[in-house]
C-alpha cells in the first residue's frame, strides 16, 4: 500500500520547532524596538545640540524654548531644557518606553549623561 503525506509525529515535530523559533525570535524583536526608541531619542538630543548652538550663534545665549526651530521624532516627548550658568541641560522620554535620555553642555551634568555633549539613556 502506497501512502502519501505526513504522519502525526512529523507534524508535531514541525509545530514544536516553529514554537521554539518563535520563542527565540519574539523577545529579540521586542529588544530591537526598544533600541530603536533609544536611538531616536539620542538622535533628537544630538539635533538639539545643533539647534542650541545655532541659537547661541545668533543670540549669544542658550534658550529653553527653540519653538519651531526644533522638532522631535514621532513618539519622543520633550525636550525639557534648562539653562545653566555656562550651558544647558535637556532630557527626553518616549511614549512607548519608561527609559529617558539626557544631555548637557557646560559644566552642570544631568544624570544619566556623564560626558558633555553626549546623550545617555537609562
Outline where the language-model segments fall.
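Conserved catalytic core of two-component sensor histidine kinases
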Residues: 15, 42, 49
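Aliphatic-rich helix starts adjacent to a transmembrane/signal segment
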Residues: 28-45
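Periplasmic/extracellular, small/polar-rich flexible segments of pilin-like filament-forming proteins
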Residues: 46-122
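Regular, well-ordered alpha-helical segments
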Residues: 23, 31-34, 50, 54-57
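N-terminal single-pass transmembrane signal-anchor helix
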Residues: 1-29
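Compositionally biased non-globular segments, especially hydrophobic aliphatic-rich helices
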Residues: 10, 39-42, 114
Amino acid at each position: 500500500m502506497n501512502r502519501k503525506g505526513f504522519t502525526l509525529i512529523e507534524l508535531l515535530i514541525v509545530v514544536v520547532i516553529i514554537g521554539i523559533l518563535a520563542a527565540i525570535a519574539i523577545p529579540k524583536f521586542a529588544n530591537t524596538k526598544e533600541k530603536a526608541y533609544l536611538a531616536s531619542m539620542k538622535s533628537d538630543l544630538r539635533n538639539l545640540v545643533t539647534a542650541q548652538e545655532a541659537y547661541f550663534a545668533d543670540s549669544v545665549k542658550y534658550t529653553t524654548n527653540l519653538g519651531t526651530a526644533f522638532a522631535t521624532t514621532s513618539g519622543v516627548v520633550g525636550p525639557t531644557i534648562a539653562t545653566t550658568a555656562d550651558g544647558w541641560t535637556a532630557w527626553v522620554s518616549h511614549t512607548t518606553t519608561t527609559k529617558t535620555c539626557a544631555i548637557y553642555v557646560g559644566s552642570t551634568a544631568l544624570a544619566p549623561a556623564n560626558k558633555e555633549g553626549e546623550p545617555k539613556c537609562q
